[in-house]
Design a protein with these regions (language model features):
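Active-site substrate-binding loop specific to GH73 endo-beta-N-acetylglucosaminidase modules
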Residues: 1-74, 86-103, 107-124
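Core structural elements
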Residues: 76-80
């Protein structure tokens, strides 16, 4: 458990899983404690206990949502999202939120954006 204090406190919220992903309530005859506090970029402390509270925190965090949007864009288009404009992440995130977090809608929006605002390729 000490490694999570050094690396990342979020790991404590996953302590109920062993090294190969099996669920456990005890380790070495001691109850597993999955409680942790995480400091956000804004400096707020968030209390987490277990994987469900971690998942809820991540799903509701706008930074995590924007990272998802950026990673999906770059995976699909194979280009850095910044090449499509400095507001592209924010614009796609706003669309994602407005669509009630529809991944299908986000994929369509990314494809439409990339096809209409693509990077010009050099002529060979």
């Amino acid at each position: 458990m000490a490694c999570h204090e050094i690396i990342n406190s979020l790991g404590f919220s996953l302590e109920n899983y062993d090294g190969i992903g099996r669920w456990r309530d005890t380790e070495n005859n001691k109850r597993v404690d999955s409680f942790t506090q995480f400091e956000t970029r804004a400096g707020d402390l968030v209390n987490l206990r277990g994987s469900r509270s971690l998942a809820q925190f991540i799903a509701n965090d706008s930074n995590a949502q924007k990272n998802f949007v950026q990673n999906l864009f770059e995976y699909m288009i194979k280009q850095p999202i910044q090449a499509y404009g400095e507001n592209t992440v924010d614009d796609l995130h706003a669309h994602f939120v407005k669509s009630n977090f529809s991944c299908k809608g986000l994929i369509v929006e990314i494809l439409c954006l990339a096809s209409t605002k693509g990077i010009k390729q050099e002529e060979s």
